[in-house]
């Protein structure tokens, strides 16, 4: 079942946040601190309350097997962009023990339908270089490159 997250889910969400962070810190130890996570519990509580930042969880038998952190973005009255609404997936994770079962695709499809209902023009996300599994997953489900961020280490 996919549903909106609530405060009772924070502990299980944290377990998944650590998994995502490990992928990032393994790929880019120069940028990501090992053993940490993206949000504090207080930050998670605030995000859960924010209707513009829905967190959807995939739950089986009271265990959260995956999540999608989303952000609704309204582009209005910007100098160079047309007015449009966009749904941004800030983070999508499936528990490492549950991957390959279609959970990520189900979460993505759920967010896609949610974004359509809100009248969004597009659904976007970012993938860190080195996260080849995620990159391939997103390509396999039909996402196309919108823009590429590049860097030169000094």
Locations of the language-model features?
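A short beta-loop-alpha structural element at the N-terminal edge
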Residues: 1-15, 24
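Conserved GNAT-fold acetyl-CoA-binding loop/helix
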Residues: 22-44
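A short helix-loop-beta-strand connector motif used in the catalytic cores of GNAT acetyltransferases and
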Residues: 42-57, 88
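Conserved beta-strand in the GNAT
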Residues: 57, 63-72, 93
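A short, internal acetyl-CoA/4′-phosphopantetheine-binding micro-motif in the GNAT/acyltransferase core
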Residues: 74, 92-99
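Conserved active-site alpha-helix within GNAT-family acetyltransferase domains
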Residues: 105, 109, 117, 129-147
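Conserved GNAT acetyl-CoA-binding A-motif
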Residues: 115-126
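Conserved beta-strand-loop-alpha-helix junction that forms the acyl-donor binding cleft
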Residues: 124-134, 151-154
